[in-house]
Each structure stands twice: as structure tokens, then as C-alpha cells.
Amino acid sequence: MRDDTSYLESQLITYIGNKRSLLEFIGQGVSVVQNKLNKDKLTCLDVFSGSGIVSRYLKQYSSVIAVNDLEKYSCIINECYLSNPTKKELEELKELYEKLTAKIDRKMKSIESSRAKGTYKNPGFISELYSPADAENIQKSERCFYTPYNADYLDVARQLIETEIPEKYKACFIAPLLSEASIHANTAGIFKGFYKNSKTGIGQFGGNGKNALTRITGNIQLNFPVFYKNDCKSYVFNQNANELVTSEELYKVVKNNGGVFDLAYFDPPYNQHPYGSNYFMLNLLASYQRPDTDLISKVSGIKKNWNRS
């Protein structure tokens, strides 16, 4: 990265097929296109953006970048990390961040106090449906994706983002929260299931081997988003890829380049396993709409109407 390596190394989601280790190789392809077209800055298209890491990488080489994904969480991630806040907007974001995190901390202290007093009431559906009530006494009927503290934090933070943050800035706070929710989950990387005790079938943090407990039980903390400031214009689409590539709307963003993209990156799902169910939790946090408990799977709590592509 030319200026800030933290932009490519932090606030990422844990993701199947993440291409972070291949960025240098992808960069070789970028150089080929630059040399062939005799252009330093390219118009770029990422049709299956996923975690957004390739789009972040391409941003430094782009005058225009258009990205797409069928999943809402991916779109929010790209809206945040491909943006170019002005100096004034950065100041506003920092002020909002300080106020927001202070409110989250106050609310979490209140919740922790209520736990100690035995008057705890879950603050939202993540703690209600996807976390045990007591980490030391997990019941067979309870899902175990997050520690009680982290589930409470996700609910509190997401609710306050919804009520306290202006619409145009929400993605800049939801995206870092999605990263934390991805990292500090009691899973091996996808949300199809959570670690359990194989003998009892009861949820257990880290499973029998107590794997990755530092990661799983570490407290979630909302971070200020990382940005890479340049003159690249970004456009985020939330469409079926087959429909997007034939739509006039897509090519309007590169009308100043003859309606064509210099470089198109296609990285479709590598197998039949659907991302809509593998990462359903991130979509729940993205929309923050409580699922109908009659319409979610019994074991993992996956919404039955997840996106199918």
C-alpha cells in the first residue's frame, strides 16, 4: 500500500476465500493493465466484493471503482471503507464516535451492574437468541455464538448507531462493528454453527479443545473506521451479478471513460455453499431487524429466507 498499510490489515471480516494473501499477485495484473493502457489510474469493477479487501487494494490504483455484492453486510463494508471523507466530515465522524462510544460504555456498565444484581434483562435479539444467559451454565437449548458480554455489546452498539448516527454516516460505524462481530464469534469462521462440547452437544466456547479462546472471549470494542484518502470515486451496488453486468446503471459511472471499465475483477463463490447462510449473522447486524423465531432454523437460528444466488 502506498500510504497506510493498516487500511489493508485492520477491520476486516473473517471470510471464506479472502484474497488478502493474493493482493501482491493481483497487483501484478493491475500493472499489466496500467502498462497496456498507459494509465496510472484505472476505472475498476469488483463484481463479487465479499469482504471488500480486493476493492480496498484496487482503490489506490483507481479513478473510479464500482463494487457489487448480493449481501447487505458487504455493501455496508464497502460504503464505509471505500469512502473519502472530507476534513469536515472526518471531524464530524470523530465527534460522533466519541459521543457514541461513551454512550455504549455507560449502557454496558449499567447492564453489567444489573447482571451482578440479578436484575438483568437482555437488551436485544442478539443476546436473546444467539448467546447463552450465563457463560458458566450454558443450556442445551441455547445458541452460543457470542459471550453474554459481546452479545449485549452488539445489541447496545447497533441500537445506538441506529438512533444516534445520521443516515449518511451509519455505514462508517456499522462496518467496524461487523468486523468485531466476525472476529469475536464462537465459530471457526462461518456462522453455520458454533463450537460445542461434542459429548453433550451443548454450546461451549472454543469447543472440546477450547480453541482460540482469546479471540472468542475477548471483548468487542467499536473502533473508529480506517480510511484511505484519494481522489477515487466509489459506487456500491447490491444486485445479482448477472443482472448488474447487463444494466445501463453500472456503465453510467464510467461514462467519462467511454462507458467501459479498464479492469474487471470477477471472484464468484468458490463452491456451492451460500454466503447468505454462512454469514447470516452479519446480515442480521447490518439490518438489525429481529428475525421471526418461527422462521429461523432451530440449531443455528438462520433465517429461512436468506439470499440464494
Can you say where each PLM-predicted feature lies in the sequence?
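Intrinsically disordered, low-complexity coil segments
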Residues: 34-41, 111-118, 245-261
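Conserved Class I SAM-dependent methyltransferase catalytic core
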Residues: 307-309
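Glycine-rich, phosphate-binding/catalytic loops in enzymes
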Residues: 61, 83-84, 253-257, 276, ...
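Conserved phosphoryl-transfer catalytic core
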Residues: 80-143
